[in-house]
Amino acid sequence: MKSGFSNTYFYYPLPDYKLPLHIYSDKHLPKDAKGWKPYYVPDSSTLIADESKLYEDIIKNNVFEFFANSFLVECSIDSREMGEIEFAILHSDRQEKYRVGTTINKKKEVHCIPLNSASKEHLLHLYENSLKMVGRGLNIVPLKLQGDKLEMSFMGYPTMEELILDAYRNKEINKIEELFDTLLKQIEMGAIEAKKENNILYELNIDKGDSKIFYGKILKTAYIDMLPRNCFMKDGLLFWFDQEWKLENIPSKYILYRAIHFLYMENPWIDEVLERRELIKRYNIQDCEESFYTLEVMFYSSVVVDKNTFFAKNTFGNGGLKEQLTNLLNFFDKRNGGK
């Protein structure tokens, strides 16, 4: 006599099943630790082991399934029709109105969905941003709006980030610089320049209008998620996706700074190939970096953390940045249909 389920399919939610941000499966396992966002721990010295430092090796040694914090299982005794969804990203750590998710099913169909009724408008902004990028001469991953979800074409090509990291592994400095040059050209392609005095950094009181810092081109409209991770590369052409955020009067070099910042933060080993400061210097960002970092922290906090919680934690530790954050929240709401 046999017992048990004859068919099973495992899912692996990260960081765990209670508040998942990424959900992998037997057919789609992580290639790196980018999906790993551990819970906030006030005092890391209390940890027996820092999971964030272990996951890269766990993945490389093909033991992710064994060490996953949680798993979900589909079970069946008479059906093999399981594993409909192969991978999902859930932006459930954001404010409610920005919570969207992306799924890839076994037919390789990609769907972007609102995680609640409040975030339907944000999904519509993503769609509109993509269409406007086409008007600037940029290529996008084909997509269409179907009811409350976006359907996108699956592209089995490497992302620009994967190609950049390959260049770091092979120590191809010229290729690294060439790819970042291409990125900056794409960021500025078809964009209308705004007046220098309209710089968002002045409007948010991050810097003063009479500042001697040269911020480069100020774009009247900018898509700040034009990062290497958000585009596929095919035959030398870039195809953009997941362009959720549009802001006005943004220095083009701020978006390039974001690309460099995230790449080096998530892949610290690349600094041994080409130092971060050298790349920052190549694009004359060194004098802008402090202002860009302030804007980045403010933007991130306005999206991910509820402003009351943010202020209560006194994250920045000074009243000046609290005032700046309030300015950004008001500014950002206006640009997205708020009061």
Residue ranges and their predicted role:
Residues 1-12:
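Short alpha-helix
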Residues 12-91, 326, 330-333, 337:
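A C-terminal cap/extension of S-adenosyl-L-methionine-dependent methyltransferases
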Residues 13-18, 78-80, 116-118, 146-149, ...:
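Short, solvent-exposed loop/turn segments at secondary-structure junctions
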Residues 91-131:
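ATP-binding glycine-rich loop module of kinase domains
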Residues 140-207:
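Conserved structural core of kinase catalytic domains
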Residues 204, 250-338:
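Helical subdomain adjoining the active site within ATP-dependent kinase catalytic cores
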Residues 204-272:
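Catalytic activation segment of kinase domains across protein kinase-like and atypical kinase folds
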